[in-house]
């Protein structure tokens, strides 16, 4: 937005998506040719035929990704029969919550309801307003929600994945075949 890409002679349009599956659809439709996505949604999309390759890494670290719930829910076991907010079906959140629930023998397909939040993702008010009973929340919204008594942390993803390949940069096969110079300049 400050002209960096234009100064490099690159005509770039930035498009936001709400999770890896949505981005994979944009790749498959040809409207996106370079992007960043979580590794689990990429692996799924690639197995389903997405014509893209990993060209870089954006983050490898512990995940500062916390599962927060209403203050009256004190553990993962308390989520049985509840609504849990995730970014989107097939997103990293979906992958993470399924792992967390499985360790407590809670069936993510029957014992809870997973609610895609899309553009509302990360808003602590969703828990306070009881739109969902729990959701993944990151800073600074997490500290604000705890301070205001809207939520409590009941688990963290880093306990399950101490070092995690959080984000990958991918490019469409078409651009890898035809626009390597441009990809190099973008990177």
Which residues does each PLM region occupy?
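Short helix- or helix-capping micro-motifs
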Residues: 145
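Extended ligand-binding regions for polar small-molecule ligands
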Residues: 2-6, 166-187
């Amino acid at each position: 937005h400050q002209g960096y890409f234009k100064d490099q002679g690159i005509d770039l349009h930035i498009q936001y998506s709400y999770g890896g599956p949505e981005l994979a659809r944009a790749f498959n439709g040809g409207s996106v040719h370079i992007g960043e996505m979580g590794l689990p949604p990429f692996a799924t999309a690639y197995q389903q035929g997405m014509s893209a390759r990993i060209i870089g890494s954006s983050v490898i670290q512990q995940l500062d990704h916390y599962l927060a719930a209403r203050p009256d829910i004190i553990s993962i076991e308390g989520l049985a029969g509840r609504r849990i907010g995730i970014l989107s079906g097939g997103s990293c959140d979906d992958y993470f919550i399924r792992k967390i629930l499985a360790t407590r023998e809670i069936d993510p397909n029957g014992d809870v309801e997973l609610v895609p939040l899309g553009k509302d993702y990360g808003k602590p008010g969703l828990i306070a307003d009881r739109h969902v009973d729990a959701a993944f929340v990151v800073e600074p919204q997490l500290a604000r929600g705890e301070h205001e008594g809207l939520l409590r942390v009941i688990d963290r993803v880093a306990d399950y994945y101490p070092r995690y390949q959080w984000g990958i940069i991918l490019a469409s096969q078409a651009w890898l075949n035809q626009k390597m110079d441009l990809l190099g300049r973008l990177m």
